[in-house]
Amino acid sequence: MTVEERSNTAKVDILGVDFDNTTMLQMVENIKTFFANQSTNNLFIVTANPEIVNYATTHQAYLELINQASYIVADGTGVVKASHRLKQPLAHRIPGIELMDECLKIAHVNHQKVFLLGATNEVGEAAQYALQQRYPNISFAHHHGYIDLEDETVVKRIELFKPDYIFVGMGFPKQEEWIMTHENQFESKVMMGVGGSLEVFAGAKKRAPYIFRKLNIEWIYRALIDWKRIGRLKSIPIFMYKIAKAKRKIKKAK
């Protein structure tokens, strides 16, 4: 099958990435409706932060790939603030890990199946165990994320398992590339790249305390506890510069 066509929700163009102007509540309803309609297509969700948008601006193939997703939501306050600067305000930030958790709540109620693809075997198994304790009605399976895009072994395992959700935690761009490489081999799945969410659910990484999330500075906490991320912080001023440049271009066009 193929992915569901782009939703008919209002779009907000942030440096070429077509974000859906939606809320967490609306996304939950969209996912419920997808299963209720028994579509044979797949629902492909991208949760894009400033780093992903930056990458997309310099990698045309990736930009075109993610713009084929059923939904693109703003995972990061930087994207929401950018939308306001460009006078196209997005309604809400929708963190990928929280959207994944909302999917798991739906799966728990409906006794569905979830396939976790990503991280190491140890981390993946720990995430699966933790989630199984939280959501006992879900059937889980896991495979590590250290695979080539063309590897058919894991695809065959997924086909045999017949999950309702496939969460791919390989980091961008690989997770989205994997989804679009193989989505036509599946049907009726919710497919979403979830970055490092498996590490968080496994307890290998901590999510920022509530106060950091409330103040929309979760990225600062992540950098403080994981020095490997410091180098990635340079994407923020680059993103801000690109937004300022886009804003000036819009003003000149008026």
From Swiss-Prot:
What is an example of a GO molecular function annotated in this UniProt entry? N-acetylglucosaminyldiphosphoundecaprenol N-acetyl-beta-D-mannosaminyltransferase activity
Q: Which Pfam families does the annotation name? A: Glyco_tran_WecG
Q: Does the keyword Transferase apply?
A: yes
> Which keywords are on file for this protein?
Cell wall biogenesis/degradation, Glycosyltransferase, Teichoic acid biosynthesis, Transferase
Gene Ontology BP term (one): teichoic acid biosynthetic process
Q: Which residues form the signal peptide?
A: none
Swiss-Prot/TrEMBL catalytic activity: UDP-N-acetyl-alpha-D-mannosamine + N-acetyl-alpha-D-glucosaminyl-di-trans,octa-cis-undecaprenyl diphosphate = N-acetyl-beta-D-mannosaminyl-(1->4)-N-acetyl-alpha-D-glucosaminyl di-trans,octa-cis-undecaprenyl diphosphate + UDP + H(+)
Zinc keyword on record: no
Catalytic activity, EC? 2.4.1.187
- Xref: InterPro entries: TAB_Glycosyltransferase, TagA_TarA, WecG_TagA_CpsF
Pathway field of the UniProt record reads:
Cell wall biogenesis; poly(ribitol phosphate) teichoic acid biosynthesis
The family classification in the record reads: Belongs to the glycosyltransferase 26 family. TagA/TarA subfamily.
Q: What does this protein do?
A: Catalyzes the conversion of GlcNAc-PP-undecaprenol into ManNAc-GlcNAc-PP-undecaprenol, the first committed lipid intermediate in the de novo synthesis of teichoic acid.
- Protein name per the record: N-acetylglucosaminyldiphosphoundecaprenol N-acetyl-beta-D-mannosaminyltransferase
From what organism does this protein derive? Staphylococcus aureus (strain MRSA252)
The record lists the lineage as: Bacteria, Bacillati, Bacillota, Bacilli, Bacillales
- Gene name, per UniProt, is tarA
